């Protein structure tokens, strides 16, 4: 069986993304991926396609790391498809035990993300996954976190990229794949 490629699954995914104007505040057009989860077969198909993409473009990966919270919706299933561990990247203070952390700048200050110490081993190749790339701060911090833990980002994948916010510019050293890119934020 030939697995569908990104260009074949993209229109199906786009049909399940809802634009919500002025959310969470006026002037923001929120891209809501939650309607996608009303179709479990499509979510499964997407995760199979992502895993197939990883096998053919990155090759070997040691783990899949997903960013809190919506990276957790796809990351574990992609990791299962690849037969590798899933590493949750969480906001500071959400993981027990010793952690490694990295910071990033938000609109009104600094925030931190972390992983549990030992979740990524020295030399591990990691596939990063999240739902959205906007300004790039969170994905930059996640990349820095993987490197700080001794790993290397084999590729980063986002479901949606808001191109006008130029988040890609913060990731010049990252092989980044986007399923859907919007020309308006």
Swiss-Prot record:
Presence of keyword Transferase: yes
Gene Ontology molecular function terms on file: adenine binding; adenine phosphoribosyltransferase activity; AMP binding
Pfam families tied to this protein: Pribosyltran
Protein localization: Cytoplasm
UniProt pathway: Purine metabolism; AMP biosynthesis via salvage pathway; AMP from adenine: step 1/1
Residue pairs linked by disulfide bridges in the UniProt entry: none
GO CC field: cytoplasm
Main location, first listed in the record: cytoplasm
Catalytic activity as recorded in UniProt: AMP + diphosphate = 5-phospho-alpha-D-ribose 1-diphosphate + adenine
Keyword Metal-binding found: no
Keywords assigned by UniProt, alphabetized: Cytoplasm, Glycosyltransferase, Purine salvage, Transferase
SUPFAM superfamilies attached to this UniProt entry: PRTase-like
Assigned EC number: 2.4.2.7
Biological process per Gene Ontology, one example term: adenine salvage
Highest taxon of the lineage: Eukaryota
Enzyme class: transferase
Family: Belongs to the purine/pyrimidine phosphoribosyltransferase family.
Biological role stated in the UniProt entry: Catalyzes a salvage reaction resulting in the formation of AMP, that is energically less costly than de novo synthesis.
PANTHER family for this protein: ADENINE PHOSPHORIBOSYLTRANSFERASE
Protein name: Adenine phosphoribosyltransferase
Gene that produces this protein: aprt-1
